[in-house]
């Protein structure tokens, strides 16, 4: 919490003393302020206010306190926030302007004799306490004597606080009262204490107007209205960004269906590729099986062929032998040339065997064959008989 600077001054015009100076003290928070009624010089204090009363001044008056800290009754009265004190005020600087409208009733002074300038003395003030962020100020009372224009002014207190959170400090109402006087325009001016708060959070600054209680006097104008105009720096506030915020759960829920669809598509593509590959493999294996089956059959046929070749060869040989040297019958060359036919399918081989049988029957039924068979038999017998005598010869030769 920033430093609290309170500026409080009271000006009282008394007809019994000469014009002098009164001091404006700046009390610290938590310490009571007591001002004694004695003339003080401006050397002892940092801020001094001088006033010269004019008993004959009439008409509307607007009082203001300029920052020069010296005023006259007819000059505008300015309450300067941030007058020269021991410690400077923190930024932002806030000014409070108090303007008082006086009624148009002319001021009447019952005494014809003029009085010399009276000193301005400060009356006793109540204690000023600060408790829990609330400023309370007891209402001081001033008294005027017989004549003159008693003017009571109370300088407003300034309180500036800077914080980030929490409500600002509340303000106390400053009320001044003037006692009854015989003559002169009793004027009571009260300026409300101003409080500004700069922060990011918390309610704005609240202000209460000071109460004015003019005393009853014989004559003289009285305060009709008080205008309180305050210039404050605006409080800073943080605006939320307009970008919509998405919950991560909603994002995950939105992404879940997309992930499921992608997974399903990937599975479908993989299954389709697997089926195509399997079908292609089946086609390749079927062609291989068919080709292998043909080869196996060919191998079996080729193996069966050579196994049956000697039998058919023997038949052909016998037929050729039966034909003899005459050339009737099938020569060996034809048999050898017909061997490749035996390596074909069984049907063709059977048909070939049938044709051979028919040829044998035809050759056997022909008369020429019978005539020819006889010499063949005879020749065979001769051939058989021929070595028979050799055997005895051999035997005979072997015997001796």
From Swiss-Prot:
Glycosylated; has a high content of sialic acid and O-linked carbohydrate structures. Phosphorylation at Ser-355 is regulated by chemokines, requires its association with ERM proteins (EZR, RDX and MSN) and is essential for its function in the regulation of T-cell trafficking to lymph nodes. It is found in: Membrane; Cell projection, Microvillus; Cell projection, Uropodium. GO terms for cellular component: basement membrane; cell surface; external side of plasma membrane; extracellular exosome; extracellular space; membrane; microvillus; plasma membrane. Residues 320-332 have a biased composition (Gly residues). Residues 21-51, 58-112, 121-164, 172-182, 212-224 have a biased composition (Polar residues). This is Leukosialin. The modification Phosphothreonine is found at residue 341. The lineage of its organism: Eukaryota, Metazoa, Chordata, Craniata, Vertebrata. Keywords: Cell projection, Glycoprotein, Membrane, Nucleus, Phosphoprotein, Signal, Transmembrane, Transmembrane helix, Ubl conjugation. It is a single-pass type I membrane protein. Cell surface of thymocytes, T-lymphocytes, neutrophils, plasma cells and myelomas. One of its GO terms (molecular function) is Hsp70 protein binding. The keyword Iron does not apply. It comes from Homo sapiens. Residues 21-224, 320-400 are annotated as: Disordered. The modification Phosphoserine is found at residues 291, 336, 351, 355, 368, 379.
